[in-house]
Amino acid sequence: MVRMAGSMSDLDRRAFLSRLGKAGALVAAAPWLEAIGLAQTRGPARAFLRRAPGRAEFDRRVLGSFLEHLGRAVYTGVYQPGSPLADAKGFRLDVAREVKDLGVPIVRYPGGNFISGYHWLDGVGPKPQRPTVLDRAWNSLESNQFGTNEFMEWCAAVGAEPLLGLNFGTGTVEMAVDYVEYCNLERGTRWSDLRRSHGYERPHNVRYWCLGNEMDGPWQIGQLQAREYGRKARDAAKQMRVVDPNLQLIACGSSGTFMPTYLTWDREVLEECYDQVDGISLHAYYGNTAQWSGNSTARYLAMNLDMDRHIHEVAAVCDYVQGLQRSSKRLWLSFDEWNVWYRARDAQSTNGHGTAAPHLLEEVYNLEDALLVGGFVNTLLRNSDRVRIACLAQLVNVIAPLVTNERGVLRQSTFYPYAWALKYARGRVLDLRVESETYPISAAGLQNDFARNGNVPFVDLVATIDESAGQAAVLMLNRDLDGEREVVLEWEDIVPARVLACETLTVPDLKAFNTFDEPRRVIHQPFAAPAASSRMSFKLPPRSYTLAHLGLRG
């Protein structure tokens, strides 16, 4: 997680892509919309949907989330001993219920920037013996009362899989390997027996691991050069696989498109460790600011297309290195930090001033933020053939869809598009092409990595099909700020039989947000759907995100 808004000068990193052949040319070229199945047309938007027999079911980990020891994410977020809202273990029951009902499939932990100064041993064993330390990433007191084993218990309670991060800042390779042994070996070694002595006889069997966090960033504790990091990752991965050969390991990719070494970092890292890792991470945060969007809501709501481009570019680098090394292995992507984050980025919002559980990064989300989150969901599902894991950063209190106080938990506006995807998007992503009228965007005055001229479709759409359940889900974003948009769904080899649910998220005020006093200002509403048929016409409200859940004819 980047502490400061990106303002570094932008090198000509995309010149590198021009040497990657067809794949690089595709994503670097101006008409990148064509690459993701979007085309220009006039009149009603039209979506042509059909089964994609060559596409496997998407990995539901693409709808994961993130929990960092930062601000109130852990303490007073998921964990608050002594609260009347907590159970005997200190877990907030209201938060656990929300997360379990959401069905979050995987949660990344414990960081984030926090991980680069964290020693996992501080957070295990008898609680009275755990040290209180100063977290230097966020200048906050860390009591270590919630650590690895508590996180594993919490994951079991909410039905989520753990994704653990390793300290590649102050941490050593040996420390990382010991952590895997503590978590995954059953018995008979120093660290597995230590876990058993802590009351956890069965191993946690953590499959997914992040090899550090944003190690290219000057804000990161223990920042490394690309090849230095790549060699460390390779060494750690080799030793970790001796302990557990079934691990899935994620190399630390570039911290973002704003970095001067963006893509070059990824290439150099992978040239050192490609054969020892399974995926590479991507991180990105977005906001409606002068630098990023020109304070234009129209440009802001198109930022999920920047995410599309980001994914294609990093995938192109992975494939380039695969070709260089004559490897048969194809890396997948882990977009394990993404969200809207731009208001709570100042020094006061990112510095805990040596206190415990300070109010940090507590972004208040409005309707336009929720619409963009819906766009991000569409992008991630659209690219789920390459993106295996993605984590909405974060889950509770810190740039999060859920916010707590002493009385309960609040659903922010961004909760709803995320919840729809988790509840309804199942099975395979459908092969589709969308034809939509467009509006222009301009590069003038924008930060280089967001600066592009082009035309953006008013309608962004993704659809999934669950063959076993006989159901389909369609998620539709209308970026038109002023007008209703008609969308005609043309089902080519699928016949909807009934509408199971149809809802929309919109309110008159784009800046409206929820509070504990007014928790339903921005909330989903029933939406009148057309009759189920092979040709369905939806009239989407202005500035809206809409779900259609359909039963299919057997």
What are these regions (language model features)?
Residues 1-15, 36:
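N-terminal secretory signal peptides
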Residues 15-38:
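N-terminal export signals
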Residues 31-55:
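C-terminal segment of N-terminal export signals and the immediately downstream linker at the start
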Residues 73-80, 115-148, 189-219, 288-294, ...:
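Aromatic- and acidic-residue-enriched carbohydrate-binding clefts of CAZyme catalytic domains
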Residues 226-377, 437-452:
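Noncatalytic carbohydrate-binding groove/subsite architecture in carbohydrate-active enzymes
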Residues 377-384, 388-394, 401, 405-451:
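Catalytic cores of secreted or luminal carbohydrate-active enzymes
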Residues 454-496, 502, 543-547:
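Carbohydrate-binding surface patches
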Residues 494-536, 540:
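Acidic, Ser/Thr/Pro-rich beta/coil linker or hinge segments at domain junctions
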